[in-house]
Amino acid sequence: MKFFIAIFLVFSVLFSSDDYELPEEFDKQTYEVGENIFEQKCTSCHVKFIDMNKVVRNFFHEDNKMNLKAPTANQISFRLKQQIGDKSDIEFHLYETADYLKSYVLAPDRSKSICLEGVIKYFNGMPSMRGVVTEEEIESLNHFLYFLEGFNGINEYFHDETLF
């Protein structure tokens, strides 16, 4: 009996669901550069992370009781992947989301927002970041935002996007 328990434990460890493989498109250095850009140039309005369940409750049940001035980075990460382009090819999807982000960050327009109307109604319009961030910085920022949510193993902010 102990033999079978030992075999079970070995296989449980070898084939546990904690094993993952990061997408080959993930670049740690670009992610960290984008994260630094976010922290330096975006956090005056955007919070980096709030649990998605709390975010949903805040906007749809508590009338923005948290007084957020702008979507959180993890909200943007989630919506970016859901609303822009074809997510079946991560490499191409990164180009699509970067193009969108450049367009929006440099010339914001509510009609181009990826956020739900029930969320953006709480925010003033985003100011243009033209002259504040370069297109190259936006590409790094896009890499950070793209991989912030939904990819286990990159950071502590993973959640199961299929639940939303």
What are these regions (language model features)?
Residues S16-F38, I50-V55:
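Electrostatic cytochrome c docking/interface patches
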Residues E62-S128, V132:
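Extracytoplasmic electron-transfer domains, predominantly the class I c-type cytochrome c fold
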Residues M1-K28, Y146-F164:
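N-terminal export/targeting leaders of redox proteins
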Residues G34, F38-F49, L141-L145:
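The canonical Cys-X-X-Cys-His
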Residues E39, S88, S111-F164:
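Flexible coil segments in periplasmic/lumen-exposed cytochrome c-class electron-transfer proteins
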